[in-house]
Design a protein with these regions (language model features):
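N-terminal Rossmann-like NAD(P) cofactor-binding subdomain of oxidoreductases
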Residues: 1-204
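Charged docking surfaces used in two-component/phosphorelay signaling
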Residues: 168, 183-262
Length: 262
């Protein structure tokens, strides 16, 4: 492991994603947290929003007062990073974005699945972060786009079947994803609160879920994709129903997944 230490800023540090980033970075031997930003909690301690990080000697600062660091991690809502990307690069050589702003390859995809893109010139330089499958592309990347949660669980579930030629891409694929309430974020609203979700199973975006775009881009196939909000807090569990054109044994499946992930 490298002994070099990198300075980092977490933009949007009060949300669930920002809090997890801060926790991971605080415990990482190669990172030093230089700054965490929050417009609503500026000057308050990180522990004010994340009690598990009370021992972290750090206060939130305004995102308008960015410091120069090695890496900026952006844990902001969709649309923020694409608007601020030039500013980010004025303060860091590497940007890791956890929103959907740089996951897709073309402006046309953003027109179809989102509301367009204000910085399409950055899309081709972005590397989709799925370390199990794109690890070799990540070192040295200037712009890293963290994959969507539901797309990640689906891609990891299906990719070994294509690599082992169990699937060719012509088959029907049905994906049913169960997700916890944290997926909606700290400001997810009533639909993500425990009283509203407890004991229920509810489909979310049953038609044209945006994570379908990432799955189709990465695997090159279309899937029938439905996400269900269920009574749990964390996690994304994808059940992928596939229909191979030839018999497949349990041993074939073990070999495919072990070959990909061991």
């Amino acid at each position: 492991m490298s002994s070099e230490t990198y300075s980092a800023t977490v933009i949007g540090g009060t949300g669930f994603t920002g809090g997890e980033l801060l926790r991971l970075l605080a415990g990482h031997p190669n990172f030093e947290i230089a700054q965490a930003t929050s417009r609503s909690k500026a000057n308050k301690t990180v522990g004010h929003s994340h009690p598990n990080l009370r021992e972290l000697d750090l206060r939130f600062s305004s995102p308008d007062d960015l410091e120069s660091v090695d890496v900026i991690f952006a844990a902001t809502p969709h649309g923020v990073s694409m608007e601020q990307i030039d500013t980010f690069y004025e303060h860091a050589d590497t940007v890791v974005d956890l929103s959907a702003d740089f996951r897709l390859n073309t402006a046309e995809q953003y027109e179809e699945w989102y509301d367009g893109h204000s910085a399409p010139e950055y899309l081709k330089k972005s590397v989709y972060a799925l370390p199990e499958l794109t690890r070799d592309e990540l070192p040295g990347a200037d712009l890293i786009a963290s994959g969507g949660c539901n797309a990640t669980s689906t891609i990891l579930g299906l990719k070994p079947l294509f690599d082992a030629d169990i699937l060719s891409g012509d088959e029907d694929i049905v994906v049913d994803v169960k997700v916890g309430s944290s997926e909606g974020g700290a400001g997810g609203g009533a639909a993500s609160s425990h009283p509203e979700r407890s004991g229920i199973v509810r489909p979310y975006a049953p038609i044209s879920h945006r994570h379908e775009a990432e799955i189709e881009q990465f695997l090159g196939v279309s899937v029938s994709f439905t996400v269900h909000a269920v009574d749990m807090t964390r996690g994304s569990s994808a059940t992928c129903h596939v229909f191979p054109g030839q018999p497949v044994s349990k041993g074939d499946l073990w070999k495919a997944y072990r070959g990909s992930y061991e």
